[in-house]
């Protein structure tokens, strides 16, 4: 095995160490992330061409193409699902425990799937797992693992081994070619003069598949593992040494000058000094620390306020450069907790990658139909009326004009409260039609005109009725008797592909962009349509995000507005080119966000004890993987100091004070060094707000308004908009308001019919019950 580890000291001075530079400049080069690829290209230009340099993920995907493909994932899901569904007490647990664990495993299908794949990727031997140290859930997953190994399903989980040299060469070339094809410089000639070794740069979190790739490539080529190391900050960089020591191979440190900030006139000096002081603090050299003034840190009260701050920066950049807003941001934000993206995704969806097929109305249609289908009754079972709304809004079912079905359903939605099937809905529609037909009293017609589902036309009712029948028929076409058919996945994929091709692409007037997306979904379906697999309907539904997704289009990947700390190592190199205008903003600086690992180290139900107590293999890949997972808690601290140390521009620090009811303080190292909190709200409180108090409706048609219209306008302008300008009537749609309306209707008719008559409580109660029984037919829900 030919693996060697190199360390360097200064990322800006790789060229200065000629021996190291000569080894890495002409060979295939694989970085931990695309940001590191971009940073090296920005800093070193043509020496790091895209096409010679790409990501490690591209390499692993090329070496294990089938294993990382959709067909393999779907087949493995079906195998695992079938074993879970048929598990019994022979797994070593009592019947009650087996049933409970089966349910939890089926609910957490994706986690279980990832855990099983990890076990195969690490070549675990079930005989080396000590059962007495396992939890019941871990015993169950080991049982599944054993069942796969000892059955014909094993062939679906075999990773290719014993590659030939030609196959490895082809995989490396393929990975580089994919990167070149997806870049803007696809026509540039790329020269790789040395093919006998490769470089893998900056990896801290090694996956089992990455380690298998390194092992296979190292059989024929020298593999250089490269990372930055600062001897002056041994405690900070110990996390890297601990991981790379597990490779049990030669480690060579290419000496160079350690970085020390000396020029106080540079704009990056204060941030560089902060990194140095944090490093000295962690090295126990507190007496060497000098802090001229407290470091400023911005305080955001909550994550929403932080997201609002980021949104303003992004909007300004978007105005300057609508085509490339991310590069136009003068403040790049890196957060130890990047959940602000969940908020920003709502306001700037186009930034987070191409919209997936399942996020389009057509995709919502397939999700909604699958949610409603009940394989036990072999029909639609409505547990959430919103699924019906999604189906009617998708544009799949026939309607006179786009959106009319959704509009009709909106008027009639309260009628369907409590409906569990399409037949229930059709039955209530039938009652409404019958009631409308037999109302002859003008006064009663006036009363029902205020009930939303009586305010629909005959044509609208007929159209909705037909759509519901078509929906049931379409659901049956896809899913009827699904679990009774052999190779049911294969049959379903063929039907789905046929429907998308013949009923959607050929029959519908679609935009070019959506046609392109559907064609790429069909390409994905080509991968899986010949899978000989049978599993439960729930398994089919849970894998929908694997097969109903378009193939990735070059240039359409996500551009996260708030980046995580894994992106710092590459982006910091880009500050060397534009140091005056760039600000690196390090956010979410609390102990909870820096030191704590919010994501689990291992996928459920595996944990540290499973890897470290229940077994003790000596394989280096196993040791590296487990050590890397355990060391992730130290990575963010390293990344923060690395970013501050090598940043050539300005910097900002911030933290989010509240996480739910929990109040947090800034990161402890910053507090020790001395910080001054600046509340973000205080920075913006005096900002002048635009006057929006006098919003006018322009070019609106004038009409004659009744006394009731003026009354509505004075009480509630929103009701005036809906009832006078839009609907022309007061119509009640809400279940609560309709119940209240029935109460008032009964009261009014009783008062009118008993006016002037002697009354008694007994007679009154009797008349109320009679009137209620007479009128409740108008409220079938």
Predicted regions and their residues:
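Basic/charged alpha-beta structural segments of nucleotide/phosphate-handling enzymes
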Residues: 34-40, 44-192, 396-439
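Conserved helicase core region in the C-terminal RecA-like lobe
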Residues: 54-59, 197-205, 331-333, 542-603, ...
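ATPase/helicase motor core of nucleic-acid motors
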Residues: 47-52, 61, 285-294, 315-456
């Amino acid at each position: 095995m030919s693996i060697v580890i190199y360390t360097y000291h200064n990322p800006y001075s790789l060229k200065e160490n000629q021996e190291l530079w000569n080894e890495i400049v002409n060979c295939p080069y694989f970085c931990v992330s695309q940001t590191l690829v971009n940073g090296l290209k920005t800093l070193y230009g043509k020496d790091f061409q895209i096409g010679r340099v790409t990501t490690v993920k591209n390499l692993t995907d090329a070496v294990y193409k089938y294993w990382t493909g959709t067909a393999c994932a779907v087949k493995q899901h079906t195998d695992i699902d079938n074993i879970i569904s048929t598990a019994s007490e022979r797994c070593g647990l009592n019947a009650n425990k087996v049933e409970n664990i089966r349910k939890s495993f089926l609910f957490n299908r994706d986690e279980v799937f990832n855990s099983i794949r990890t076990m195969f990727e690490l070549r675990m031997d079930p005989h080396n797992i000590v059962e007495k140290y396992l939890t019941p859930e871990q015993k169950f997953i080991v049982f599944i693992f054993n069942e796969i190994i000892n059955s014909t399903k094993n062939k679906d989980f075999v990773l290719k081994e014993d590659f030939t040299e030609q196959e490895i060469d082809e995989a490396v070339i393929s990975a580089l070619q994919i990167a070149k094809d997806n870049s803007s410089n696809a026509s540039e000639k790329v020269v790789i003069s040395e093919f006998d070794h490769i470089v893998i740069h900056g990896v801290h979190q090694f996956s089992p598949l990455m380690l298998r790739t390194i092992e296979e490539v190292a059989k024929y080529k020298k593999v250089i593992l490269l990372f930055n190391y600062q001897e002056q900050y041994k405690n900070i960089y110990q996390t890297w040494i601990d991981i790379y020591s597990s490779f049990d191979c030669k480690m060579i440190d290419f000496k160079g000058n350690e970085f020390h900030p000396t020029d106080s006139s540079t704009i990056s000096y204060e941030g560089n000094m902060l990194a140095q002081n944090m490093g000295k603090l962690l090295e126990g050299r507190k007496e060497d620390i000098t802090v001229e003034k407290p470091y400023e840190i911005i305080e955001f009260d909550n994550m929403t306020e932080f997201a609002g701050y980021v949104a303003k920066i992004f909007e300004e950049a978007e105005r300057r450069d609508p085509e490339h807003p991310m590069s136009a941001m003068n403040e790049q934000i890196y957060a130890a907790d990047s959940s602000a993206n969940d908020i920003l995704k709502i306001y700037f969806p186009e930034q987070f990658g191409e919209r997936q097929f399942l996020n389009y109305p057509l995709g919502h249609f397939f999700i909604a139909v699958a949610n409603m289908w009940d394989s036990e009754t072999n029909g639609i079972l409505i547990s959430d009326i919103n699924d019906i709304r999604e189906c009617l809004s998708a544009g799949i079912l026939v309607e006179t004009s786009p959106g009319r079905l959704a509009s009709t359903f909106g008027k009639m939605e309260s009628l369907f409260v409590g409906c569990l099937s399409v037949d229930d809905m059709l039955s209530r529609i039938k009652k409404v039609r019958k009631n409308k037909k037999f109302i002859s009293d003008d006064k009663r017609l006036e009363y029902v005109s205020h009930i939303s589902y009586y305010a629909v036309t005959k044509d609208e009712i007929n159209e909705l009725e037909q759509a519901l029948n078509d929906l049931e028929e379409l659901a049956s076409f896809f899913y009827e008797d699904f679990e009774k058919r052999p190779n049911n996945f294969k049959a379903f994929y063929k039907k789905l592909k046929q429907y998308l091709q013949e009923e959607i692409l050929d029959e519908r007037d679609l935009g070019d962009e959506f046609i392109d997306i559907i064609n790429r979904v069909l390409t994905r379906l080509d991968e899986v349509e010949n899978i000989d697999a049978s599993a439960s309907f729930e398994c089919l539904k849970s894998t929908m995000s694997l097969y109903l997704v378009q193939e990735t289009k070059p240039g359409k990947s996500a551009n996260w507005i708030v980046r995580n700390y894994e992106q710092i190592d590459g982006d910091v190199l880009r500050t060397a080119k534009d140091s005056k205008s760039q600000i690196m903003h390090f956010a979410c600086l609390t102990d909870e966000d820096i030191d704590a690992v919010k994501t689990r180290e291992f996928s459920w139900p595996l944990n540290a004890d499973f890897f470290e107590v229940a077994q003790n293999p000596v394989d280096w890949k196993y040791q590296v993987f487990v050590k890397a997972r355990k060391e992730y808690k130290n990575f963010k601290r390293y990344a923060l100091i690395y970013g501050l140390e090598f940043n050539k521009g300005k910097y900002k620090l911030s933290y989010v004070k509240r996480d739910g009811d929990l109040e947090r303080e800034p990161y402890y190292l910053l507090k020790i060094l001395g910080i001054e909190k600046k509340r973000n709200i205080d920075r913006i409180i005096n900002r002048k707000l635009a006057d929006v108090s006098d919003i006018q409706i322009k070019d609106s048609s004038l009409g004659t308004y009744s006394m009731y219209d003026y009354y509505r306008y004075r009480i509630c302008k929103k009701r005036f908009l809906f009832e006078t300008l839009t609907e022309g009537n007061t119509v009640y749609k809400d279940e609560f308001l309709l119940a209240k309306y029935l109460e008032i209707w009964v009261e009014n008719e009783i008062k009118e019919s008993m006016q002037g008559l002697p009354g008694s409580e007994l007679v009154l109660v009797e008349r109320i019950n009679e009137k209620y029984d007479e009128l409740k037919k108008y409220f079938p829900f």
